[in-house]
Amino acid sequence: PLRLVGSEMCIRDRLKWVVMLAPLGLVFFLSARIHALKASTAQAVFWIYAALMGVSFAVILIQFTGASVARVFFITAGTFAAMSIWGYTTKKDLTGMGSFLFMGLIGIIIASVVNIFVGSSALQFGISVIGVLVFVGLTAYDTQNIKNEYAGHLDDETQGKLAISGALRLYLDFINLFIMLLQLFGDRR
């Protein structure tokens, strides 16, 4: 019986890593190959990615109370909508923000990897605060970029690929903003 329990735990641990890392692999695949894929194939990969994110998100959400998840979701939705509208309507060119926001994103990734080993709540707080700022900025930046990409008169296939690419970017902005806000304002169980 102990052997079986150990095997089940090992399988669960492996499954947890697959569920957590598979969406990341699909994001890299879709980002790198979107121009080589047909729009319909890219869309199918995007839907598979979204489904896997739903499964992996369950692992995160069970750590928080339902009320705090709902509260943070509405805060995220309002913030995302406001920044997306601003990015779409502003006359200011946000292109210059791109490299700064990308550097911030790289910093968040590096700090998050370090914090896996360090386990510092202060570092996690800093990552979350900076993450909110970066993903708020990326929401406006990506929205304006998508608008500008669509301004060119492109064929239907290219527009389909741009739609998937844009949806992926905004989806990632929303999900990551939600996670950062949940780290800051979510009530743990």
Describe each model-derived feature in a short phrase.
Residues A39-A51, A70-T76, T95-L105, S128-V129:
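Cytoplasmic-side transmembrane-helix entry/capping segments in multi-pass membrane proteins
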Residues L26-A39, V59, A82-L94:
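C-terminal ends of transmembrane helices
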Residues F46-V59, F102-V113, K161:
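Small-residue-rich segments of transmembrane alpha-helices in multi-pass membrane proteins
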Residues F178-R189:
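Juxtamembrane boundary at the C-terminal end of a transmembrane helix
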